[in-house]
Amino acid sequence: NRVVAAFDTDEGMWGGRLALEYRTAGGLWYALASRGYKAGGVNSDSAVPDDQRRFDTESMWNYELGVKTRLLDDRIDLRAAVFVQDRDDVQTDQALVLPIVGDACPCEFVDYQTNAAAARSYGLEMEMNWRVNRSLEAFASLGLLETEFVDFLNFSHVEADPDTGTPFDMDGRELPQAPSYQVALGAVWEFARRWTLSGEFEAKDDFLFSSRHQVGSNAYELVHLRLGYRTPRWDFAVFVRNLTDATIRTRGFGSFGNDPRDGYAVEPYYQFGAPRTFGVSAAYAF
């Protein structure tokens, strides 16, 4: 039997931006409020339950205060902003884990979209470039972020119970892909004619990969170095990335089993970032 579901395809959506700017001899101060949206839609896979076939339009209000200025006789460029974001009907990526044959894994994924009632975020972003002298330039950036779901009952979370229809309550839990801090520091030193030495340090807090499970990235720190030689047309370099050979999780899954040796028990699976990497490069400008 064929079941046809009808949905109203007419919907009014609106967005906009209002900003106030104050310019001084030293820079620009601003305040803004903006509203954006992400259109809703339909989950077309027939495996998705009828009551979750449609997902609603998401909207977001963003409020921001910031400054862009120059300091120390224009040798420092500074940009900083604080923000608050209120999101309603947050679209979240979900997935059904369905056995391919019988009632046990191996399994397949059916991806679909659903809505959390709301989410709240606030944070700070800062960037700085400092021309220390004719031979040395430094840079730094900082990002601080706090996020949380509001009133989100997740029926596809690994800790939900599909047999009884009991969801996993994610109210107050952090959003995925939202580390609480990100830091970058670096410098470029021209120590001889046409020769440069640069280094960069970056750090990121731990964060969840998905709203379906508790698997996430570990907090990590990375160090990169580069020695370069430049002519009017050629640019040569030797470099090392991830100098300390840190282990970085870039992606992960934690809601299914994939190994028949342990009876397809549910366990995490990870993809990792590049290990310590040495290399050389050459570029020619035509």
Residue locations for each model-derived region?
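Transmembrane beta-strands of outer-membrane beta-barrel proteins
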Residues: G16, W29-A31, Y63, I76-A80, ...
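C-terminal beta-signal and adjacent terminal beta-strands/loops
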Residues: D93, A203-S210, Y229-F286
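Hydrophobic, lipid-facing positions within transmembrane beta-strands of outer-membrane proteins
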Residues: W14-L18, D51, W61-L65, Y112, ...
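Gram-negative outer-membrane beta-barrel transporters
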Residues: V84-D86, E108-S211, S281-A285
